[in-house]
Design a protein with these regions (language model features):
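Glycine-rich, flexible N-terminal cofactor/catalytic loop recognition
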Residues: 1-64
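A contiguous loop/helix-start segment that scaffolds small-molecule binding in enzyme catalytic cores
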Residues: 1-2, 6, 82-83, 162, ...
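Generic beta-sheet signal
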Residues: 8-12, 80-88, 136, 161-165, ...
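Short active-site oxyanion
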Residues: 30-36, 110-114, 162-163
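General beta-strand structural signal in soluble alpha/beta enzymes
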Residues: 38, 113-118, 165, 191
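Conserved helicase motor
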Residues: 60-69, 142-146
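Short Gly/Thr/Asp-enriched flexible loops that form oxyanion-binding sites at enzyme active sites
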Residues: 94-109, 176, 180
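Class I SAM-dependent methyltransferase SAM-binding "motif I" and its flanking Rossmann-like core
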Residues: 100-159
Length: 279
């Protein structure tokens, strides 16, 4: 493969629904790129029209069904010196959207990858959810099959960080019901739909309450679901901690090992547990 000169892959952050959110850099790259790969070429044409941008480069489709086939040609074009832009229907490429395979292949070929950052449904939903944003994890779309979905939620039930999911309107009722069953109906959550669009809506409440709300009034449009992390377990009282240490020592553990194990089990400083047993 020829050496890369100015060739590169540029990931474009597209508006979630409001064209006014498009950055100046997005406009510039769309107008100047040699090749633009779009998840939906018709949506790209509408966006370009809304932004009054004339795309001078060649436009090709790039979506889940043709990623494997089209990736090599995009990487080859960038390796030959072309500026190749990738844009999805909304948000950042690679984040539950096409792009990951292209980025991996570009890195493997020594082709530079950069981004023109833009809107993200993940961080937008977090910001408006009213739930803790200091630590979070993005889980993408839950499994479609109920059994696999419940198993995924069971594995996440004790996750302390705020969780963010994408979900389709026709599956959100089942997803909320399974979350309420696995996490408990009172776990706080926010259902965010049609973010930045005219019919934007944020429904907040416990998972059980949201499940009932969705059953009565099914939402439409693109959905981002934000769920609070598992609450911290209450600290056992001093007598219970002493009893745990004593039980471990009776089972053969040394005093030091028993204290270490109890402190680790409850997320407490070792010296705090040691002080209780030394009194």
């Amino acid at each position: 493969m020829p050496a890369v000169a100015d060739g590169r892959i540029v990931l474009l952050g597209a508006p979630l629904g409001n064209p006014a959110d498009a950055s100046g850099r997005l406009r510039s790259v769309l107008a100047s790129a040699d090749l633009v790969a779009a998840e939906d070429t018709r949506r790209l044409a509408r966006l370009a029209s809304d932004l009054d941008v004339v795309i001078s480069g060649r436009v090709v489709s790039y979506f889940e069904g043709n990623e494997d086939r089209r990736t090599p040609s995009l990487v080859a074009a960038a390796a030959d010196g072309a500026c190749v832009a990738l844009i999805t229907d909304g948000g950042m490429p690679s984040v539950s959207d096409p792009g990951y395979r292209l980025v991996v292949a570009a890195h493997a070929a020594g082709v530079p990858v950069t981004a023109a950052p833009g809107p993200s449904a993940v961080t937008t939903a977090l910001a408006v959810s009213g739930l803790p944003c200091d630590r979070f994890c993005f889980e993408g779309f839950p499994p479609r099959r109920a059994a696999a979905r419940r198993a995924r939620f069971a594995a996440l039930a004790s996750e302390p960080r705020t969780l963010v999911f994408f979900e389709a309107p026709h599956r959100i009722a089942g997803t909320l019901a399974d979350l309420a069953g696995g996490f408990g109906p009172d776990r706080p959550a926010a259902l965010c739909r049609e973010l930045t669009k005219p019919y934007e809506q944020v429904r907040r409440g416990g998972l059980g309450e949201l499940a009932e709300s969705v059953a009565a009034d099914p939402p439409r449009g693109e959905i981002t679901l934000v769920v609070a992390g598992a609450p911290a377990a209450p600290r056992p009282d001093d007598a219970a901690l002493r009893a745990e240490v004593a039980a471990r020592r009776a089972a053969g553990a040394t005093g030091r090992d028993a204290v270490d194990a109890v402190a680790a089990a409850h997320g407490l400083p070792r010296r705090e547990v040691y002080r209780l047993t030394a009194d």
